[in-house]
């Protein structure tokens, strides 16, 4: 694998029921490979709000960027049209086309038997029960991790999944897709459909919905591959060292 430019920024976008801490095991391995990694805290209040929040984070960076989205975060990164963004990485993520909603692609195929029912509260936000994290969100993760995931979960507004998506950047720029073959939240068939439609480079693996926790090395490798393939190398002699 080629080296990664020193001024590259990897921007990590969490999905629903999560915050930036879901990338905790990915950040340092990326930085040991010479790239800055930052998390974009999106509010999960509407797709538009989340796009604006990600745009603000991008304004803090300089140089080329690679956007990485997990689950719902894929819809957010796809809406960014900043010229400094060189590629997209989808980690078991959703990638609606222009005019589609997150809900339309999420429910394209039958949900897994262990997938939780998504019912909004009186404020229009969806929370997950505690056991949803051990049964579906990260069924291969440790009990400690799933307990923390449940405790820090942030609800997602129904507006996020009902708002039509704008024209996606993946139609113009290269994308990578980590397809989670044992995903219990987003049907792997749906992931395959989206990845093929995008023309993404697909990395399929027998991982669950949250490989940031359960297959960290794989996630880091896919991100670094996207960065190396789409950005000019500053130091051709440097080697990428996965951790």
Where do the model's predicted regions map?
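Conserved loop-alpha-helix segment in the C-terminal half of the alpha/beta-hydrolase fold
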Residues: 181-213, 218, 225-226
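Short, proline-enriched alpha-helix->beta-strand connector loops that line the catalytic pocket
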Residues: 8, 170-175, 197-200
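Flexible "cap/lid" loop of the alpha/beta hydrolase fold
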Residues: 84-130, 157-160, 164, 194, ...
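Conserved HGGG/HGGXW glycine-rich cap/lid loop of the alpha/beta-hydrolase fold
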Residues: 5-48, 65-66
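Active-site nucleophile elbow and catalytic-triad environment of alpha/beta-hydrolase enzymes
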Residues: 148-169, 181
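Conserved acidic catalytic loop of the alpha/beta-hydrolase fold
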Residues: 48-65
């Amino acid at each position: 694998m080629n080296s990664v430019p020193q001024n590259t920024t990897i921007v990590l976008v969490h999905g629903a029921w999560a915050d930036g801490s879901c990338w905790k095991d990915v950040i340092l391995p990326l930085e040991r490979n010479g790239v800055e990694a930052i998390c974009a805290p999106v509010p999960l209040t509407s797709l538009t709000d989340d796009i604006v929040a990600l745009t603000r984070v991008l304004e803090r960076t300089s140089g080329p960027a690679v956007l990485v989205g997990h689950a719902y975060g894929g819809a957010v990164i796809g809406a960014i049209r900043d010229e400094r963004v060189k590629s997209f990485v989808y980690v078991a993520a959703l990638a609606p086309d222009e005019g589609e909603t997150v809900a339309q692609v999420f429910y394209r195929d039958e949900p897994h038997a262990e997938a939780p029912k998504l019912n909004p509260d009186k404020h229009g936000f969806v929370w997950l029960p505690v056991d949803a994290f051990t049964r579906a969100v990260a069924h291969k993760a440790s009990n400690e991790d799933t307990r923390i995931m449940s405790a820090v979960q942030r609800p997602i507004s129904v507006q996020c999944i009902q708002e039509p998506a704008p024209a996606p950047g993946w139609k113009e720029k290269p994308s990578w897709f980590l397809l989670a073959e044992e995903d219990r939240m987003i049907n792997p068939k749906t992931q395959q459909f989206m990845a093929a439609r995008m023309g993404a480079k697909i990395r399929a693996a027998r991982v669950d919905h949250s490989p940031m926790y359960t297959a960290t090395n794989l996630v880091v490798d896919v991100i670094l591959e996207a960065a190396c393939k789409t950005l000019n190398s500053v130091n051709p002699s440097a080697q990428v060292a996965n951790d």
